[in-house]
Amino acid sequence: MNIHEYQGKDILRKFGVSVPKGIVAFTAEEARQAAEQLFEEQENPVVVVKAQIHAGGRGKAGGVKLAKSPDEVFDIARQMIGCTLVTHQTGPEGKEVRRLLVEEGMNIEKEFYVGITLDRATSQNVLMVSTEGGMEIETVAEETPEKLLKIQIHPLQGLQGFQARQAAFFLGLEGDKFKNTVKFITALYKAYTAIDASIAEINPLVITKEGKVMALDAKINFDSNALFRHKDFLELRDISEEDPFEVEASKSNLNYVRLDGNVGCMVNGAGLAMATMDMIQLAGGKPANFLDVGGSASPETVEEGFKIIMSDKNVKAILINIFGGIVRCDRVAGGVIEAAKKVGLDMPVIVRLEGTNAEIAQKMLDESGLNLIAANGLREAAQKVNEALS
């Protein structure tokens, strides 16, 4: 689950991670009042107005601006709230700005990158630091890997003091700046583990001219599978930032991810879903979604998934690929039939069913009177999808 920058900073602050003073605003007037409060409390002659959306690249898109007075903050906020911000992470449709973070300005001397996430290749958390703060870390890793240090963290031992010092040495810091950075990294790891985050990224981490170490930006994502331990974090969820199809799917406990293709997919099992998407691509099509109905799918959840797929206007054909192990094929067939009758079929639907009660399911589909195309294998199913689209 993703949260906004200001929410992430509020959480990090509780664990001793240094972050600038900031106030969230939902209107231009609230932004002005926030600026008045910050100017009274700080010596810096500027504040920063930052659009709050679940995407990076806001600065280049005009979503981060400096202001020297409350009136200037008001004017910026009036232009920014309600506008659509398009970044390299939002896609061409962009995201509407509904809230802002008004934050104290910083006298920046140096910028770095610090992040902690899970390295799936080693099944360990990894601390990453780079001297190239403010840049996309993927770009740094690809173009200048010598400027990125990765430190594996043993799951039983946790982050060790020498590892935090190693990271600070890599950044070329000395004296109080070195000590403060070690303290910062240690606090960040403490927060990362305590809240069950999947990523805690500070980009940039800044050293101010006064010697302070501060998180100028913060990206915190939670492990959704651990949210049962942090029910208060569910209140931080901003549904308006999420894809409406994915929100609807989550209500039925469906694993759905929207893509930009034209072939809707309904599959049971993440591995089979990935293989199905690959086969569609190889056959000349393009997947419109990832949808795993899971092993305990009921006719109701299948029906809901089918409706969600058909609600996507980009979908021109649907491939249903079910291997019945735990989930019974007749359950899936029942859900498809009910959904098709309620929504109406106006596109080709290719069905491949194998496993538990596959013959019963096929008979149900044959007797339904619906225009469904049967396939006897995954490759054949993908080819029939491509034929239906041509």
UniProtKB/Swiss-Prot annotation:
GO terms for biological process: succinyl-CoA metabolic process; tricarboxylic acid cycle. Gene3D superfamilies: ATP-grasp fold, A domain, ATP-grasp fold, B domain, Succinyl-CoA synthetase domains. Keywords: ATP-binding, Ligase, Magnesium, Metal-binding, Nucleotide-binding, Tricarboxylic acid cycle. Residues 9-248 form the ATP-grasp domain. It catalyses: succinate + ATP + CoA = succinyl-CoA + ADP + phosphate; GTP + succinate + CoA = succinyl-CoA + GDP + phosphate. Its cofactor is Mg(2+). Pfam families: ATP-grasp_2, Ligase_CoA. It is an enzyme of class 6 (ligase). Signal peptide: none annotated. Substrate binds at N268, G325, I326, V327. Binds 1 Mg(2+) ion per subunit. Heterotetramer of two alpha and two beta subunits. This is Succinate--CoA ligase [ADP-forming] subunit beta. It comes from Prosthecochloris aestuarii (strain DSM 271 / SK 413). The lineage of its organism: Bacteria, Pseudomonadati, Chlorobiota, Chlorobiia, Chlorobiales. The gene is sucC.
